[in-house]
Amino acid sequence: MAVMPPRTLLLLLSGALALTQTWAGSHSMRYFFTSVSRPGRGEPRFIAVGYVDDTQFVRFDSDAASQRMEPRAPWIEQEGPEYWDEETRSAKAHSQTDRVDLGTLRGYYNQSEDGSHTIQIMYGCDVGSDGRFLRGYRQDAYDGKDYIALNEDLRSWTAADMAAQITKRKWEAAHAAEQRRAYLEGTCVEWLRRYLENGKETLQRTDPPKTHMTHHPISDHEATLRCWALGFYPAEITLTWQRDGEDQTQDTELVETRPAGDGTFQKWAAVVVPSGEEQRYTCHVQHEGLPKPLTLRWEPSSQPTIPIVGIIAGLVLLGAVITGAVVAAVMWRRKSSDRKGGSYTQAASSDSAQGSDVSLTACKV
């Protein structure tokens, strides 16, 4: 009988331990890859980031001096040198696959060599509160538009256009969906359980939102009421407005949840109301960190507990340090969040140095 390598055994044991535990709600692991061609300026730039829930834990940038996958969360730093070697090797392999794919896709779309083009990939898995597999994802985009996605059954593909049909036929012939499914239901889940255990103080915490309301006159007849939620984790939150108890969904301006730069999140929802009728409107906040939903109503004497200028300044500073390509990837992720996708990687093997995003022999587009 073959002897199981120590690292693989450790991963399996951590997975078995995780199945004896329960967590609040579901959890996810996601990888986001972005490749941007730079005609006349050398190789495409490749950026890879990994997230567990809403926390970034690894990052690779082909333009960085280190040329290594780097930790972005304290709990991942405990992984040994073999882990980082494998994660780096996988990222570099993906970058080379994307370099070839950028040229192939340019040909599919009959594009010249002069312009810059972008490939974006998202893949990952979700587990339930019992640590068992819920769903997997794989989505690809080209130049900011959907290209091909693994369907919810993890057995078939949806192609967005005629060019993507070519890729679909290639991947079907190579049985790519079966390989992705094996990774998503196996290795992805095992590593996610391990990360949730190792990073439980961060990943399994709940920080309730700090809430307040602001009032912004528009004219003599109208004003904007804005309901703020700040400093919360995890990112999932619900803000709703009601007028005399009736939902005002259609009339609500709602921004996407934004990172605050300190590991927590921010969000606001606003409605335009007739002057003098502010008391008829209530904001309702639901979050995992709250024992029960909060209800806020504008009081003329109420003041924001956190200056709005400070919030805006924080968001501007955050934006200055985020790479444009990663922002594009996250924006595309949110745009595509209602669809199911999948993976670019493989199931657990006997490779003792295996990482959580170990790559397959790549299926090119």
Curated annotation (Swiss-Prot):
Compositional bias ranges of the Low complexity kind: 346-359
GO cellular component annotations of the record: early endosome membrane; ER to Golgi transport vesicle membrane; external side of plasma membrane; extracellular space; lumenal side of endoplasmic reticulum membrane; MHC class I protein complex; phagocytic vesicle membrane; recycling endosome membrane
Residues bearing carbohydrate: N110
Compartments where found: Membrane
Signal peptide bounds: 1-24
Quaternary structure and interacting proteins, as annotated: Heterodimer of an alpha chain and a beta chain (beta-2-microglobulin).
Stated role: Involved in the presentation of foreign antigens to the immune system.
Name of the protein this chain belongs to: Patr class I histocompatibility antigen, A-2 alpha chain
